[in-house]
Amino acid sequence: MFINKLSQEVKISGIDKKQIYSNGTFESLVVAVEKGMVVPAQPAPADAGLYLISGKIEFEIAGKKTCVEADDFFSFSKGELHGLTALENSKFIISRNVFE
């Protein structure tokens, strides 16, 4: 059994990010964003998967916008430009390789 305290919490206005697992090469984060928060498009540092726990976001990958709702999952590749706009207060888990 592995138990990890929610450590390395990062709070920025409109966004709350907590690392819930890391083994040095892979990590999982829980991210909460407030309605109206915009994260500008940026290249993905690694292949990643995102699972939306609650809320609704507009996620942009390579210029294409998609509405993502609670219980949706999708993945994207290292280097892909991605960003989001929170349409509601939302919470998601993102899992990714730390080093590729």
Question: Could you describe each region identified by the protein language model?
Answer:
Residues A46-I57:
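Glycine- and acidic-residue-biased ligand/ion/polar-headgroup-sensing regions
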